[in-house]
Amino acid sequence: MLFTYNKNPQYDSILMYAASNGYDKIVKLILDKVGTSFKEHIHETILLWAFQNEHYETIQLLIDHGFNKLVISNLLTNKNQFDVSNKYLIYFMADEEYYYQVRENIRNDQRVSTIKNTYRI
């Protein structure tokens, strides 16, 4: 897939396209081969596209490669920008065992009443 000829105006890069569509294998391949030496605003944009489209595994993959998960936390404090619920913040704030329980609840669109206030960085 080359995006240099008929560039999609919604995406600045193939990484942004792959992240926003949840193509985890492509995201991992790009990050492993190219690295993450992008400008900070591009990091934020790629992470936000994945978040807005609810690709949680892709988000975790980006975070594991150095993308800043506080971008999502900051996004959730500004609800005018995107209509999201606090339940998605839990994904980034939970320990591993709690994360799997919460992720299952999110997939089933169930509300989670408790939030752990510790970041795993």
From Swiss-Prot:
Q: Which SMART domains match?
A: ANK
The stretches annotated as ANK repeats are: 10-40, 42-71
Keyword set for this entry?
A: ANK repeat, Repeat
Name the InterPro entries on file. Answer: Ankyrin_rpt, Ankyrin_rpt-contain_sf
Which Gene3D superfamilies does the UniProt entry name for this protein? Ankyrin repeat-containing domain (1.25.40.20)
Pfam families documented for this protein: Ank_2
What is the protein named?
Putative ankyrin repeat protein L215
List the source organism: Acanthamoeba polyphaga mimivirus (APMV)
